[in-house]
């Protein structure tokens, strides 16, 4: 697959183009092989250098990369025996939320996540990963099913936000989100939430309340997009970089604030460079967290979860 490079990756793109050009020449020339090897190392070093100093708004660009692995990609790489479950039993089946029963290393779990879609047809069908109320109600139905059978719940967050259309508001978008926050806080099974791309506001939180919150290294989590924030505060989306810095949207910043428990390392250059490696890292992290949670008594699980969220926003006054 040909990689799409972001604007700040253009020096890398030029090196990769040169490498591809040389690869199409006589592959038996030893000098040529050495030159390609040297350029590959140079590209790797340059990628490392650029990604070591990404600004917050550049991290947001990586989180939205069109080739970044989505929920269904992780599902195929990490799980077996997936059986999708459809509908909220009240209105419709929202394709922006995918969920169902699956196994991870043989252990039965309930998997739920937001899916953006790859091509135009899929993006439209999945509403670009922006769930409607019926999507969140479907997610809650699946969580309650998991609770009934004592299955851990694994959620994968990747949305610019809940769908803000009039029809969604008419069907109770805010109520659906609020209901999920309440119900997830009281689920009597382990809940592990992972931000794999964009974690956009209440649309992300509606499947983001759990015992453990993890973020992929180049994912983001925020109450509003940098562009949206800039449009409100500066009346100009061009100030997105300033907004991103002020919002503190990146995994390291959120872990520093105690809002995230673990950062899952991505391959050099981002998860889209090597989706299988990214999935392997995430799978290891989930299995590790499941091992820590699976034998906790229900009362202890709920109390720890409650205290975890009660600590949010605490600060000391000097």
Swiss-Prot record:
PROSITE patterns: COA_CT_CTER (PS50989). Residues 31-292 form the CoA carboxyltransferase C-terminal domain. One of its GO terms (cellular component) is acetyl-CoA carboxylase complex. The keyword Nucleotide-binding applies. It is found in: Cytoplasm. It comes from the Bacteria. Pathway: Lipid metabolism; malonyl-CoA biosynthesis; malonyl-CoA from acetyl-CoA: step 1/1. It catalyses: N(6)-carboxybiotinyl-L-lysyl-[protein] + acetyl-CoA = N(6)-biotinyl-L-lysyl-[protein] + malonyl-CoA. Its main location: cytoplasm. Component of the acetyl coenzyme A carboxylase (ACC) complex. First, biotin carboxylase catalyzes the carboxylation of biotin on its carrier protein (BCCP) and then the CO(2) group is transferred by the carboxyltransferase to acetyl-CoA to form malonyl-CoA. InterPro entries: Acetyl_CoA_COase_a_su (IPR001095), ClpP/crotonase-like_dom_sf (IPR029045), COA_CT_C (IPR011763). GO terms for molecular function: acetyl-CoA carboxylase activity; ATP binding; carboxyl- or carbamoyltransferase activity. This is Acetyl-coenzyme A carboxylase carboxyl transferase subunit alpha. Keywords: ATP-binding, Cytoplasm, Fatty acid biosynthesis, Fatty acid metabolism, Lipid biosynthesis, Lipid metabolism, Nucleotide-binding, Transferase. The keyword Mitochondrion does not apply. Gene3D superfamilies: 2-enoyl-CoA Hydratase, Chain A, domain 1. Acetyl-CoA carboxylase is a heterohexamer composed of biotin carboxyl carrier protein (AccB), biotin carboxylase (AccC) and two subunits each of ACCase subunit alpha (AccA) and ACCase subunit beta (AccD). Signal peptide: none annotated. Belongs to the AccA family.
């Amino acid at each position: 697959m040909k990689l799409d490079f972001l604007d700040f990756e253009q020096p890398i793109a030029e090196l990769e183009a040169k490498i591809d050009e040389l690869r199409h020449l006589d592959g038996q020339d030893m000098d040529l092989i050495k030159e390609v090897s040297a350029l590959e190392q140079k590209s790797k070093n340059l990628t490392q250098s650029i990604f070591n100093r990404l600004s917050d708004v550049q991290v947001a660009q990586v989180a939205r990369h069109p080739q970044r692995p989505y929920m269904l990609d992780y599902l195929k790489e990490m799980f077996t025996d997936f059986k999708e479950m459809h509908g909220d039993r009240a209105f419709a089946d929202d394709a922006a939320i995918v969920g169902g029963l699956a196994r991870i290393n043989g252990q039965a779990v309930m998997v739920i996540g937001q899916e953006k879609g790859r091509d135009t047809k899929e993006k439209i069908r999945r509403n670009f990963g922006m769930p409607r109320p019926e999507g969140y109600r479907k997610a809650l139905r699946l969580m309650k099913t998991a609770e009934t059978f004592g299955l851990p719940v694994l959620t994968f967050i990747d949305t610019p936000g809940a769908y803000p259309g009039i029809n969604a508001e008419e069907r109770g978008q805010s109520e659906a989100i609020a209901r999920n926050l309440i119900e997830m806080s009281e689920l009597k099974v382990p809940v592990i939430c992972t931000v794999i791309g964009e974690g956009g506001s209440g649309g992300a939180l509606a499947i983001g309340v759990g015992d453990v919150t993890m973020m992929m290294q180049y994912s983001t989590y925020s109450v509003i997009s940098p562009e949206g924030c800039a449009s409100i505060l500066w009346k100009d989306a061009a100030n997105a970089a300033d907004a991103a810095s002020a919002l503190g949207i990146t995994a390291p910043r959120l872990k520093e604030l105690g809002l995230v428990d673990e950062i899952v390392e991505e391959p050099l250059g981002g998860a889209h460079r090597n989706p299988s490696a990214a999935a392997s890292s995430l799978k290891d992290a989930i299995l590790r967290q499941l091992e820590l949670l699976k034998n906790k008594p229900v009362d202890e699980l709920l109390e720890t979860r409650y205290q975890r969220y009660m600590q949010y926003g605490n600060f000391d006054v000097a």
